[in-house]
């Protein structure tokens, strides 16, 4: 881990650390760009509070919607709704006036600012 508590090194790459509130306490998350099999954006969160990073959650859901692409994805408000407002306030997500239903849940489409996943000096 880097000496700066706001930066975490993983696989030779620097990631910005977001101290966020979960229902059970504080977590320190980094966000990583991945993709679904159809090539659309998937965002993984890893908890770096401990000695080793642990997979925390997939923050997006793949609804096979034509509005999804490499920049826009539906936020998983069903499992990670408590992070939605915090990431919005941090400027990581920008909600769009579109949502989609799956089962009993409605998911907002967001534009993800992937530049916020890395420290400012790495952009």
Task: Give names to the regions the model predicted.
Residues 76-122:
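Short, compact, well-ordered microdomains
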Residues 44-92:
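Acidic, aromatic-enriched beta-alpha/helix-loop junctions
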Residues 2, 122-123:
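Low-complexity, intrinsically disordered extramembrane tails and loops of integral membrane proteins
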Residues 2-5, 12:
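Elongated scaffolding segments in large macromolecular assemblies
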Residues 26, 67-69, 99, 118:
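A generic structural micro-environment signature
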Residues 10-15, 19-24, 28-58, 66:
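Catalytic phosphate/metal-binding cores of nucleic-acid and nucleotide-processing enzymes, i.e., regions
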Residues 6-8, 67, 78, 115:
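Intrinsic disorder/low-complexity detector
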